[in-house]
């Protein structure tokens, strides 16, 4: 079986991806800032008959991601798949946006993707096999009111994805992005009913997406 890392795997889209990859036969590294919340994901992976490694990882910290890769190689001997899913929002109109909220979103969403990707590229290129999937966002292409930081981070992830794909294709390491629209997760549950209704009117199916929709796209 393949060894797959899923960051931000404790809930929402990350959990759905971890479960789907386990069902497809991969052993899963459940990487999240909160390993207590990750226990449900671990249980689901094990229920699918695969191994799970529950690691506390702050993707914004390069030392953490490097230690994560070293731990996986020590325990399981290889890394085949990386899904860069960890992400946060700190919404606000630009004039009201605090610099710390701008920086934090970029650190997690963009720098986190950079750190994790860099940590796994060496073992992937060495074994001449790797699959990296970055979870971007449709907001990175369209923009969205109150999300200058988030939109900038996700637009950057798309550019990063295209570049790293070109750099490592010759080593049989593919790098792709999946850009979800509005998905029914804890991140969107904070939206008011009016905002949700307005969003649904823009969607042909007239509903928010589900984490399973995205997990199937990743698979």
Predicted regions mapped to residue ranges:
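Canonical Rossmann dinucleotide-binding motif of NAD(H)/NADP(H)-dependent dehydrogenases/reductases
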Residues: 2-29
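The beta1-alpha1 cofactor-binding region of Rossmann-like NAD(H)/NADP(H)-dependent oxidoreductases
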Residues: 35-36, 56-67, 99, 212-213
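Substrate-binding pocket helix/loop in short-chain dehydrogenase/reductase
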Residues: 93-94, 98-106, 199
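Active-site helix of classical SDR
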Residues: 117, 153, 161
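Alpha-helical segment proximal to the catalytic Tyr-Lys
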Residues: 122, 166-170
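Residue(s) in the substrate-gating loop at a strand-loop-helix junction
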Residues: 137
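C-terminal helical subdomain
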Residues: 177, 200-219
């Amino acid at each position: 079986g393949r060894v797959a890392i899923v960051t931000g795997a404790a809930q929402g889209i990350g959990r759905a991806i971890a479960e789907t990859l386990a069902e497809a036969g991969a052993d899963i590294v459940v990487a999240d800032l909160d390993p207590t919340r990750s226990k449900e994901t671990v249980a689901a992976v094990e229920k699918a008959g695969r191994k799970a490694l529950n690691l506390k990882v702050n993707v914004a910290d390069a030392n953490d991601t490097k230690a994560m890769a070293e731990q996986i190689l020590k325990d399981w001997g290889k890394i085949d798949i990386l899904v860069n899913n960890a992400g946060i929002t700190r919404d606000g109109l630009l004039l009201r946006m605090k610099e710390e909220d701008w920086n934090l979103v970029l650190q997690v969403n963009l720098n986190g993707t950079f750190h994790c990707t860099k940590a796994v590229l060496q073992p992937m290129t060495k074994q001449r096999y790797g699959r990296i999937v970055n979870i971007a966002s449709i907001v990175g292409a369209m923009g969205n009111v109150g999300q200058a930081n988030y939109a900038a981070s996700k637009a950057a992830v798309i550019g990063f994805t295209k570049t790293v794909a070109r750099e490592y294709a010759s080593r049989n390491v593919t790098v792709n992005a999946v850009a979800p629209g509005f998905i029914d997760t804890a991140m969107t549950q904070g939206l008011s009913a009016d905002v949700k209704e307005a969003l649904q009117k823009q969607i042909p199916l007239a509903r928010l997406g589900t984490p399973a929709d995205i997990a199937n796209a990743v698979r």
